[in-house]
């Protein structure tokens, strides 16, 4: 394992690593709505315009990160948001714009690793009122094989 931390989509290493990585984790900047129970003041700073701006940034980061996995490699997209616009919306638009990419079932992948089933269908979803944690979203995407 050789971890690489790439802080932004314009990092010079992106070109060198394109198509060579087994797995990429995108910890996308988000509203943090999944942390409202610990940070209740967030609700006063969120606006539709701020969410739209973050969704555009998340989409750009995900598209840029999609260049990195090798054929058959995986891309994990995660946020600490509960907003569908930042989660399923970003992933759905990515899948529509990138033919061949497959959305895998995160709960099934975790179950094969012995982790209790957590999620809703194909996504990993931690909900504060259900799991007693901050809210979290995760999606596992697989690049088409060569």
Question: What residue ranges belong to the model's regions?
Answer:
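S-adenosylmethionine
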Residues: 1-146
């Amino acid at each position: 394992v050789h971890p690489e931390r790439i802080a932004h989509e314009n990092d010079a290493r992106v070109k060198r690593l394109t198509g060579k990585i087994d797995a990429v984790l995108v910890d996308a900047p988000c509203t943090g709505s999944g942390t409202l129970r610990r940070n209740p003041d967030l609700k006063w700073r969120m606006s539709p315009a701020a969410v739209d701006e973050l969704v555009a940034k998340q989409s750009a980061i995900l598209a840029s990160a999609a260049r990195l996995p090798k054929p058959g490699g995986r891309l994990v997209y995660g946020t600490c948001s509960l907003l569908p616009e930042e989660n399923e919306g970003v992933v759905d638009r990515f899948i529509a714009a990138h033919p061949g990419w497959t959305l895998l079932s995160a709960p099934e992948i975790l179950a094969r690793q012995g982790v209790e089933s957590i999620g809703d269908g194909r996504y990993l979803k931690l909900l504060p009122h259900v799991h007693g944690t901050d809210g979290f979203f995760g999606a596992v995407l697989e690049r088409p094989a060569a």
